[in-house]
UniProtKB/Swiss-Prot annotation:
InterPro entries: P-loop_NTPase, PRK/URK, Uridine_kinase, Uridine_kinase-like. Gene3D superfamilies: P-loop containing nucleotide triphosphate hydrolases. The gene is udk. Its main location: cytoplasm. One of its GO terms (cellular component) is cytoplasm. Pfam families: PRK (PF00485). This is Uridine kinase. ATP binds at G13, A14, S15, A16, S17, G18, K19, S20. GO terms for biological process: CTP salvage; UMP salvage. The lineage of its organism: Bacteria, Pseudomonadati, Pseudomonadota, Gammaproteobacteria, Alteromonadales.
């Protein structure tokens, strides 16, 4: 492979479906072969639009499960720059402030970039940049229970707010946008991020792409 080739893998699916776990597993196992500086993970959440011009009351009303809440154009631009051998400054998003913060995270070009996010497969421009894509096909009720536990413990949310958001936007947007995007996935993974066979298949695919 030439020095600027970059394999981009996307892992999509419902919130709390196991995307982060399978991404971390692949990252940890491949970096031993490639080197820590040659593989990176980009979370789609980092590209939620800046809402610093809105009040907190207005920010909490945003439908974060709709594609319009995300700046996919910026993500596409960053991926194109990385593929061409240039570093990018990835935004940092605060789940408690519901907007971007001043800090950014610099990413240098990588041999492998793993994208993870709920709406990655809904955007045709993003799909065109992917070398392989995965959809985590975890039952929605299991995802909800995981999300409830995670958001209360890690993101400063109340149980009531998580349940309300699930009813108003998370479940409806999953049915409208996320689940239909499954048709664009190359690999559909049942049973969540601990599916070892699916993880090995994806790793083999990445290694095959790198060998081209």
């Amino acid at each position: 492979m030439n020095s600027q080739q970059c394999v981009i893998i996307a892992i999509a699916g419902a919130s709390a479906s196991g995307k982060s776990l399978i991404a971390k597993t692949i990252f940890d196992e491949l970096r031993r072969d490639l080197g820590t500086d040659q593989i990176g993970v980009i979370n789609e959440d980092a590209y939620y639009r800046d809402q610093s011009h809105l009040s907190m009351d207005e920010r909490v009303l945003t439908n974060y499960d709709h594609p319009k809440a995300l700046d996919h154009q910026l993500l596409c631009t960053h991926l194109q720059l990385l593929k061409s051998g240039e570093a990018v400054d990835i935004p940092c998003y605060s789940y408690t402030e519901h907007t971007r913060i001043a800090e950014t995270l610099t990413m240098t070009p990588k041999k492998v970039i793993i994208l993870e996010g709920i709406l990655l497969l809904t955007d045709p421009k993003l799909r065109a940049l992917m070398d392989a894509s995965v959809f985590m096909d975890t039952p929605l009720d299991i995802c909800f229970l995981r999300r409830l536990t995670r958001d209360v413990a890690e993101r400063g949310r109340t149980m009531e707010s998580v349940i309300s958001q699930y009813k108003k936007t998370v479940r409806p947007m999953f049915l409208q946008f996320i689940e239909p995007s499954k048709q664009y996935a190359d690999i559909i993974v049942p049973r969540g991020g601990k599916n070892r066979i699916a993880t090995d298949i994806l790793k083999t695919r990445i290694q095959h792409l790198l060998a081209k």
